[in-house]
Regions:
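C-terminal cap of thioredoxin/glutaredoxin-like
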Residues: 1-15, 19, 74-78, 82-184
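Conserved beta-strand termini and adjacent loop/short-helix elements that scaffold enzyme active sites
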Residues: 20-22, 56-58
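Short glycine/proline- and acidic residue-enriched helix-loop micro-motifs
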Residues: 48-54, 116-121
Length: 184
């Protein structure tokens, strides 16, 4: 859902958005855990953004998926948005196991990323330190969940806020930036 919101932000405000790995539930062990959550608070947002969101059973960790996404980002940056969309659909539409290296490779099958590279990186957890470092940076900003948005390197906004909220925040930051520019 954050990606759908980000598309709207880009269209409305011509902003650049950088994505950083952040495990939603780092405490979930390999194999996943029973999921009793229905995410009912997110249903209206999913409907507004016209996206499908079915909670999976079990709820799986995302460590390997984040590592695979980092591989795609570095090996084929122009295809990373496609890969992230496929990860979303694998979890929330198709209920696939995004910790399975073969699933992660399959999601990139037609991308310009070597299958063997994704498989090796996620099997050996080679980029797990990068995922953890990203989470440490997010925690330093005060992030406690996803999505969290850092705007202009000045303000961290938690959660899936609506378009009007972001309109107000971005307009306020632009006013501050303009006032600071006038003071120079």
């Amino acid at each position: 859902m954050a990606r759908a919101r980000a598309v709207r932000l880009k269209e409305r405000h011509k902003v650049e958005i950088s994505w950083l790995p952040y495990e939603l539930h780092p405490e979930i062990s390999d194999g996943g855990t029973a999921n009793s959550r229905k995410f009912s608070a997110l249903t209206p947002i999913a409907e507004e953004l016209e996206i499908v969101m079915r909670p999976s059973e079990p709820f799986r960790p995302t460590r390997k998926a984040h590592q695979a996404a980092l591989v795609v980002e570095h090996a084929s940056p122009d295809e990373v948005d496609t890969y992230h969309q496929r990860l979303y659909e694998a979890v929330w539409v198709e209920e696939r196991d995004i910790e399975d290296p073969l699933v992660l490779c399959d999601l990139a099958a037609d991308l310009a990323v070597p299958h063997e590279l994704i498989e090796r990186v996620v099997t050996e957890d080679e980029l797990l330190p990068a995922v953890r470092s990203s989470m440490e940076r997010a925690h330093a900003w005060g992030a406690t969940g996803t999505p969290s948005w850092v705007i202009d390197n000045k303000l961290m906004v938690p959660g899936l806020q609506d378009d009007e909220f972001f309109d107000r925040v971005i307009q306020r930051l632009e006013s501050i930036r303009n006032a600071e520019g006038d003071a120079d």
